Amino acid sequence: MLNTKNKFMKTILFISTITLLLSCSNSQNSNSTISIDLDASKSISINNIFSKMEIIPLETNEKSIIQNIDKIIEYQSFIYILDRRQKAVLIFDSHGKFISKINTIGRAPDEFYLLEDIVINRFANTLECLDPMGKILTYSLQGQYQSSIYLPHPPMAYHYLHILNQDSILLYTNPTKYNDYTFRIFSRQQDTFVSQFMKQKKIINGECRQPIQVYKDSIYFTQAFSNEIYKISNDTLLPAYQWDFGKYTYNLSKMKFPDLTNPEEQIKFYKEVMYSSKIPYTLGFNSQNDRYLFCSLFMKNKILNILYDKTTKRKVVFSKSKEDIGLYPLYMDNNKIIGITDETLVPLEPLENTQNIEIIKKEIIYTLTDYSNPILIKYIFK
């Protein structure tokens, strides 16, 4: 079975001497600051937040095997899983039945060299896949190839995309010393960039799952090592809100770093600094819906989940519930959070023994092996 903990650590702990986006002008402040006492973590009942949970084993066969889950999208009764390691998108129905796999590697128009991101184009009702080498491939919702777009160079690579409208595509490039800009807007009609924005400065950088989020047609941007959440407006990043974790809050711009291009210095940095009092957490996942602001902090040996009720201002901080149920989030919308099981962080057994749980295809649960596909959990909000 997929080792999600090791996968996460490899992703989030990747540190290099690249860059972090500059903060907006010092004169600009966030519209709101949410102060959270991380020491106030409580083992609340999972039923206080969620009306029910669904356990969905993903079908395992020769074609559907998943190596890593890098992104999940749920759309129109389909579940789309990006697996960067095997350069594939796997499509399942809402009950975990395997539908199809996109895995056409090559240089032809209907092929890709790598896969870095996927999104749903709601204007055309299609799936868009990003080859970081400069190509966007369009597929039907069932995975049939339709067309390709070739992107300009520079930059050397692209890492995330979002469909702004029928014509415009927002593209994000991980900062490096060779890049001027992090964000670009590409016009399909003009076949070129119509805007480039946000410069950077050298510092360390890590990866937050789904750094680009959409809520009510607004686009938000999150970084693993920053509590500041930005809203993308036209060709500008504006502070939207920020998390304040009190004594645990840190500021990379005020830290001194060794030469992280040196392997020995990297190893030392991992051992002595990451998940220590200097950098006690990374922002692993951040999102929102009509009711909640939500984030997950990845700390040493645990995930700390934070829910902030926009209306009541109530704050919930928990690692595991009273029922010993954890939450490893990969997707969130107005109705639910989708996560996965994990041997250490979110074991399956407490889920099976709790109330308000629905197990899809229960017979599969009893035949799982180390080679079985991951198990998804839908946490349905009250």
Give the positions of each predicted feature:
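C-terminal motif of bacterial Sec signal peptides marking the signal peptidase cleavage site
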Residues: L22-S23
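Blade/loop signatures of beta-propeller domains
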Residues: Q28-E59
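Short beta-strand elements that form the blades of beta-propeller/WD-repeat-like
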Residues: S35, F78-D83, N125-D131, D167-P175, ...
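Blade-loop segments of beta-propeller domains
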Residues: E59-K63, K97-A124, D131
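Asp-box/WD-like beta-propeller blade repeats and closely related beta-sheet repeat scaffolds
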Residues: P132-N179, Q196-K201
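Conserved blade-ending motifs and adjacent loop-strand segments that build the rim/top face
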Residues: Q242-K254, T311-N334
